[in-house]
From Swiss-Prot:
Listed InterPro entries: Bifunctional_GlmU, GlmU-like, GlmU_C_LbH, Hexapep, NTP_transferase_dom, Nucleotide-diphossugar_trans, Trimer_LpxA-like_sf
Protein's GO biological process: cell morphogenesis; cell wall organization; lipid A biosynthetic process; peptidoglycan biosynthetic process; regulation of cell shape; UDP-N-acetylglucosamine biosynthetic process
Active site, per annotation: 362
Assembly behavior: Homotrimer.
EC number annotated for this UniProt entry: 2.7.7.23, 2.3.1.157
Alphabetized UniProt keyword annotations: Acyltransferase, Cell shape, Cell wall biogenesis/degradation, Cytoplasm, Magnesium, Metal-binding, Multifunctional enzyme, Nucleotidyltransferase, Peptidoglycan synthesis, Repeat, Transferase
NCBIfam families given in the database record: glmU (TIGR01173), PRK14354.1 (NF010934)
UniProt source species: Pelotomaculum thermopropionicum (strain DSM 13744 / JCM 10971 / SI)
Linker as annotated region, ranges: 230-250
Pathway annotation: Nucleotide-sugar biosynthesis; UDP-N-acetyl-alpha-D-glucosamine biosynthesis; N-acetyl-alpha-D-glucosamine 1-phosphate from alpha-D-glucosamine 6-phosphate (route II): step 2/2; Nucleotide-sugar biosynthesis; UDP-N-acetyl-alpha-D-glucosamine biosynthesis; UDP-N-acetyl-alpha-D-glucosamine from N-acetyl-alpha-D-glucosamine 1-phosphate: step 1/1; Bacterial outer membrane biogenesis; LPS lipid A biosynthesis
Protein name: Bifunctional protein GlmU
Length: 457
């Protein structure tokens, strides 16, 4: 293909007031830069150069294997940034798309249309322009009396009359590679900011008699830039709505989209119902016929079919088919549940395997444990897995019955079909089918309470 792309991602984004490079702030679960890289790749462009500056090492890690990285050591403006990509495009004679790294809503189809229009127009440069309802903050496209583009004026340098123009420069261009980098070297910082503006290349081309075309975008939302946290929230809201609409179109019921938050990387099966105030994040996968929420958060979780998760938190865990979770359960990383497992209210499970049909109904902690199939873990059971230095395992065999308020002091094994008496502290292994009881014998003193009251009188 005769297309290459350069993504300008060197700015710090001072208005974000963050230590993190602006382009790495997450939108709907992914760094905003990843949206632009993916859109470029989806448009069929294989040669991609990302120009990084502030936080360049972090940016490079994000695009590793997807793009080459050019370094802009000193942030001297967009023209200077594009110039840093020159060595990576040495000998390239095709067309160069130039994009900003802070416009995550841009779509691959728009980039393909821009490139196609540029070819048809036979121009040296083509601008992607738009007419938003509020053009404030954007550079204005200046045309002559015949409608030809003659220059772009940044808003900070625009006159009052120029600020009334609604057509804006989106910061996305298509250039002929031939002559581009020579023209960039001719740009001077003759503006209020003392920076080398890429927009000045339009006047250079016009003075040289080279054609500059403009392709107007139908949906200005695509080029919404993110410069501060407020704009980040606006784009997040827009993208989340789009994600939820896609889910609903695929057969998922979202009871209240306004209070449901699903990352773009999440997959949900049909006939699943998502209740309000549910957060599905990261690489979470939800099966079919599930009920998720209300008030639940799942992060990088894998959930089977027919599962209920109510008012619970599930982090990096796997849940088998037909399980019931919650309310108010907490599944911590590396937890794996088999089929038909019940994890009830106020139960915390960490780094444990729970077998098919087992139940942990309420008020229990299970950590570093392997629990077999058909096990019942009574209310208030605790696996005492930490001795102050090390975490120790607990193993419970198939069909075991753990009485309420049992303390299992790890390392310890409970055999298949074994039973522990309520209130026991188990420190030794229990054989298959055995009963283990460890508690003080009950003492009964008749009439003790009345005598105690009489003494107080």
């Amino acid at each position: 293909m005769d297309l290459a792309a350069v993504i300008l991602a060197a700015g710090r984004g001072t208005r974000m007031k963050s230590k993190l490079p602006k382009v790495l702030h997450r939108v709907c679960g992914r760094p905003m830069l990843s949206y632009i890289v993916n859109a470029v790749a989806a448009a069929g462009i294989k040669k991609i150069v990302v120009v990084a500056g502030y936080g360049a090492e972090q940016v490079a890690r994000e695009v590793e294997g997807l793009a080459q990285v050019a370094l802009q050591a000193e942030q001297l403006g967009t023209a200077h940034a594009l110039l840093q990509a020159g060595p990576f495009l040495s000998g390239f004679a095709g067309k160069v798309l130039v994009l900003c790294g802070d416009t995550p809503l841009i779509e691959a189809g728009t980039l393909a249309k821009l490139a196609g229009f540029h070819r048809t127009a036979g121009a040296a440069a083509t601008l992607l322009t738009a007419e938003p309802d509020d053009p404030a903050g954007y550079g204005r496209v200046i045309r002559d009396g015949r409608g030809n583009v003659i220059k772009i004026v940044e808003e900070k340098d625009a006159s009052p009359a120029e600020k009334l123009i609604r057509e804006i420069n989106t910061g996305i261009y298509c250039f002929e590679a031939a002559g581009l980098f020579d023209a960039l070297k001719g740009i001077r910082p003759a503006n209020a900011q003392g920076e080398y503006y890429l927009t000045d290349i339009v006047e250079i081309y016009v003075r040289a008699g080279l054609a500059v075309a403009a392709f107007k975008l139908e949906n200005p939302v695509e080029v919404t830039g993110i410069n501060d946290r407020r704009q980040l929230a606006e784009v997040e809201k827009y993208l989340r709505r789009r994600v939820l609409e896609d889910l609903m179109q695929s057969g998922v019921t979202v009871l209240d989209p306004a209070s449901t938050f699903v990352d773009g990387t999440v997959r949900v099966g049909r006939d699943t119902v998502i209740y309000p105030f549910t957060f599905l994040e990261g690489s979470t996968i939800i099966g079919e016929d599930c009920v998720i929420g209300p008030g639940s958060r799942l992060v990088n979780a894998v959930v089977g079919n027919g599962v209920s998760v109510q008012n619970s938190v599930v982090i990096e865990s796997q849940i088998g088919d037909c399980c019931s979770i919650g309310p108010f359960a907490y599944l911590r990383p590396e937890t794996r549940l088999g089929r038909n497992v019940k994890v009830g209210d106020f139960v915390e499970i960490k780094k444990s395997v729970i077998g098919d049909g087992s139940k942990v109904p309420h008020l229990s902690y299970v950590g570093d444990a392997t629990v077999g199939a058909g096990v019942n873990i009574g209310c208030g059971t605790i696996t005492c897995n930490y001795d102050g230095r090390n975490k120790w395992p607990t193993r419970i065999g198939d069909g075991a019955f753990i009485g309420s308020n049992t303390n299992l002091v790890a390392p310890v094994e409970i055999g298949a079909g074994a039973v522990t008496g309520a209130g026991s502290t188990i420190t030794k292994n229990v054989p298959d089918g055995a009963l283990a009881v460890e508690r003080a014998r009950q003492v009964l003193v008749p009439d003790w309470a009345a005598k105690k009251r009489d003494k107080k009188v």
